[in-house]
Amino acid sequence: QIGAHLGKNPVTVSDRTDRGQATLATGFPSRFPISDAKAVSSFAEILTSFGKVRMIGSACASLALVATGSADVYAEHNIMFWDIAAGLAIVNGAGGTFELEGVNLPEGIHSEPCTVVASNNKFDVSVTMFDKMRGLA
């Protein structure tokens, strides 16, 4: 059966629409410019725009939280595609969506880190949420 399942039971993304009640799953970006006050402030701004934040240390497990409705959004900057590929397929199978920036599929999957946002498709979130942190806004 096509879709995302936990055992024999289908899973679906949450239907939450209130960002203040939503859970963001994320990770601390590798190569983060910790001494850059603007980047730190921008990252904190992203985190505090959600009701809850979860950092569990595994991109794929974080994406599984989105797929099962335990989290509403997963966002991370500077992550390698192989760390998220399987999780993105699970989110997609559970009815969620995702956006990638910085990876040219399929030939670019082994080269540069990318930025990803996956969600239940109920929030206005995109990879541009990291623009201020990256000094692009």
Predicted feature locations:
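An extended, acidic
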Residues: 12-137
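DPxDG-like acidic metal-binding loop motif
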Residues: 1-8
